[in-house]
Curated annotation (Swiss-Prot):
Annotated organism of origin: Mus musculus
Protein name: Kinetochore-associated protein DSN1 homolog
Chief location bin: nucleus
KW Transmembrane helix (keyword) present: no
Gene Ontology CC: one annotated term: spindle pole
Subcellular location: Nucleus; Chromosome, Centromere, Kinetochore
GO biological process assignments: attachment of spindle microtubules to kinetochore; cell division; skeletal muscle satellite cell proliferation
Record field: compositional bias (Basic and acidic residues): 87-104
UniProt entry tagged with the keyword Transmembrane: no
């Protein structure tokens, strides 16, 4: 009896000590082992659990059963998703993996310190185009610095010549980036995206506006059609407009039996079918139209030829006049004509 009472007294203490290290593992997955303190706590709890199980096997089995019942009771408060994701065996395997430092989540490799310093050396207060030019220049200098130690071991390598060429190239690159910044090429790298987005937005807006207008016009047309049908159904035939009655009359075909016995039978029978005659002569009319078009074109060409010939004759006449007057300037007759008239007493 005493042994039974002692075991019953010791069971709650054992379950309490066993629940303490397992309490963090009952939380959601966000509490995975990531810190050293948490790993130490887990290892300490597992060691205590092993000590308790090793000291008394019967008590260990009873504690394991109590722990399973407690975990099942606590699992009722969890969502089905958490129950499916975090079973006890998987949780224990996670603990063992974390203690063995196996299958840990691997993070990305850190950036090279030179690259971070390269970005930090560029001021944030500069414009985007200026920062891009400075980044190009700094990248070239960084590449030269990293290339220099590899080339030192090569044969016939001159460090001074290499540095001189690198400095000259850096100066040329600086002038080139300045020129790109002045002519606006670097600014286009940041403006084209916004322009394309603005153009796409304006195009979408215009398309939506056109679609809206189309729907409005279609609705308006349907409304006018309904109004016309309503008017035609309500207005009697006597009050219809003259144009509509005329169209109706032209569409009606007269039955020949209505005028067979009339006095105008012979006249109507001898009346030629002008519509048929015109339809038969459609080909002739088409040829006449082509001939008239050709005549009109030839007349236009003759008019243009006459205009060109008159202009050419005027030009030739002006040239002949100029040449004839130039020849008369050196003639003695023209010089004599240019002499002033002498006074009358001298002639006497």
């Amino acid at each position: 009896m005493t042994s039974v009472t002692r075991s019953e007294d010791q069971e709650p203490t054992m379950s309490e000590t066993q629940d303490r290290p397992l309490q963090p593992s009952l939380k959601p997955l966000e509490a995975l082992p990531q810190s050293s303190a948490y790993q130490e706590m887990m290892t300490q709890g597992v060691s205590e659990e092993k000590n308790h199980l090793g000291s008394n096997p019967g008590e260990g089995e009873s504690c394991g059963a109590d722990h399973q019942e407690g975990s099942q009771l606590r699992s009722f408060h969890l969502s089905p998703q958490e129950q499916s994701i975090r079973p006890q065996d998987r949780r224990q395997s996670w603990r063992r993996a974390s203690m063995k430092e196996v299958n840990r989540r691997k993070s990305l490799a850190p950036f090279h310190p030179g690259i971070t310093e390269l970005c930090r050396s560029i001021s944030v207060k500069l414009a985007q185009s200026q920062r891009l030019g400075a980044l190009l220049l700094s990248s070239f200098q960084f590449s030269v610095e990293k290339l220099e130690p590899f080339l030192k071991n090569t044969k016939d390598f001159s460090l001074e010549c290499f540095r001189a060429k690198a400095s000259s190239l850096s100066e040329e690159l600086k002038h080139f980036t300045d020129r790109l910044g002045n002519d606006g090429t670097l600014q286009k790298c940041f403006v084209e995206d916004s322009k394309e987005k603005a153009a796409d937005f304006s195009l979408e807006a215009s398309v939506a506006e056109v679609k809206e207008y189309i729907t409005k016009f279609s609705l308006e047309r349907q409304a006018w059609d309904r109004l016309l049908l309503q008017y035609q159904n309500e207005v009697p035939p006597e009050e219809m407009p003259r144009g509509s009655t005329e169209t109706r009359i032209t569409e009606v075909k007269v039955d020949p039996a209505a005028y067979l016995r009339s006095s105008q039978k012979e006249v109507l029978s001898t009346k030629p079918d002008y519509q048929r005659i015109v339809q038969d002569q459609n080909q002739v009319f088409a040829y006449v139209e082509l001939v008239m078009d050709e005549l009109q074109g030839s007349v236009k060409q003759l008019q243009a030829l006459m205009d060109e010939s008159t202009q050419y004759l005027q030009k030739v006449s002006v040239q002949l006049k100029k040449r004839s007057m130039d020849q008369l300037d050196s003639s003695p007759a023209r010089k004599l004509l240019k002499l002033p008239l002498q006074s009358s007493p001298s002639t006497q």
